[in-house]
Amino acid sequence: MKNEGTLAEVVFLRDVRGGRPENAVGIGEFWYEPEIWSLPLSPAAKVLYAGLCSFLGHGEIHRKDLRATLKDSSDEGIAEALEELVRNKLLEPASEAGPSGYAVRAIG
């Protein structure tokens, strides 16, 4: 997804994080690594990463859910947070998931 200030209606997600670590936060398949909070990322990118992880079990997140995750952000701000996660190798554009998809990677 290009940073054009617009978001796809549905962003497809693929989990490539590997096994759930012992210190994971969350329940069942809906978990994230707490180390996200100590990374040198914007607050929006940190919150978005945790939010995306909570939707991995569904394999997708809808635009309305992205907006709810980052309530005070514009669509352009959400797109910028997605790009920040790509730059920091926490998200990988997933061509097999479609033009609006990402593979979510583990921290470290």
Predicted regions and their residues:
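Winged helix-turn-helix DNA-binding recognition segment
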Residues: 52-108
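Short recognition helix of helix-turn-helix/winged-helix DNA-binding domains
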Residues: 1-65
